[in-house]
Curated annotation (Swiss-Prot):
A Gene Ontology term for the protein's cellular component: inner kinetochore
Listed PANTHER family: CENTROMERE PROTEIN K
Breakpoint for translocation to form KMT2A/MLL1-CENPK oncogene, annotated site positions: E96, F97
Phylogenetic classification of the source organism: Eukaryota, Metazoa, Chordata, Craniata, Vertebrata
Protein known as: Centromere protein K
UniProt keyword RNA-binding present: no
Length: 269
């Protein structure tokens, strides 16, 4: 059994190739005849010179004929079929596997390169994250320390300021009361008992009267110690003219329901 028996199409392929060669030879002979005709025409013209346009036209005509013949040959030519023997199949398989291997190696190389770049990016981002966490921890510690310092400083500062203000107010109050006492003792003294005895309509009382300064201190202390009930009972030690003086000048107010009780006007409110 020979190769032609294994491949029945091989005889047909050989015949097609032979026919194509014969046709190509005929076309070449026709082109040769055309060239001879052109040569004869040139000989008949003699010494006449062809113009550039005629010469170019002749060359173009020849090129068109050559290209037409070549195109016709390729159109009529059928691809040669390779007999699919075991060796051929193995060779084709090896070529395909080799090509596939090269493609896969290229893809693998690309993926490895991308993975390497992603790994570098991940490491860089991780380092950045660690640095940010360290900075955040440091800032938290610093914030906590500053907060404690500010709170301690603020509390101690406020306490010292309030203490200083209270001392200043206390000193000012004592100074004001001292000045007020001196003023009241000079201008509003207690009634002279010798003068009282001369007046027939005034009975001598065994009660010790208090000064206007002492009356005001009682009213002031009551106002600040018991602000919800600042009224004071008018006792026998309060000299009535001084009580009326305080009421007439708006320094003291009577209780709306009990006229025997008075209070100091809240000038500080």
């Amino acid at each position: 059994m020979n190769q032609e028996d294994l491949d029945p199409d091989s005889t047909t392929d050989v015949g097609d190739v032979t026919n194509t060669e014969e046709e190509l030879i005929r076309e070449c002979e026709e082109m040769w005849k055309d060239m001879e005709e052109c040569q004869n025409k040139l000989s008949l013209i003699g010494t006449e010179t062809l113009t550039d346009s005629n010469a170019q036209l002749s060359l173009l005509i020849m090129q068109v004929k050559c290209l037409t013949a070549e195109l016709s040959q390729w159109q009529k030519k059928t691809p040669e079929t390779i007999p699919l023997t075991e060796d051929v199949l193995i060779t084709l398989g090896k070529e395909e596997f080799q090509k596939l291997r090269q493609d896969l190696e290229m893809v693998l190389s690309t993926k490895e390169s991308k993975n390497e770049k992603l790994k570098e990016d991940l490491e860089r981002e991780q380092r950045w994250l660690d640095e940010q966490q360290q900075i955040m921890e440091s800032l938290n510690v610093l914030h906590s320390e500053l907060k404690n310092k500010v709170e301690t400083f603020s509390e101690s500062r406020i306490f010292n300021e309030l203490k200083t203000k209270m001392l200043n107010i206390k000193e000012y109050k004592e100074k004001l009361l001292s000045t007020l006492g001196e003023f009241l003792e000079d201008h509003f003294p207690l009634p002279d008992r010798s003068v009282k005895k001369k007046k027939k309509n005034i009975q001598e009382s065994s009660v010790n009267l208090i000064t206007l300064h002492e009356m005001l201190e009682i009213l002031i202390n009551r106002l600040f110690d018991v602000p919800h009930d600042p009224y004071v009972k008018i006792s026998d030690s309060f000299w009535p003219p001084y009580v009326e003086l305080l009421l007439r000048n708006g320094i003291a107010l009577r209780h709306p329901e009990d006229p025997t009780r008075i209070r100091l006007e809240a000038f500080h409110q």
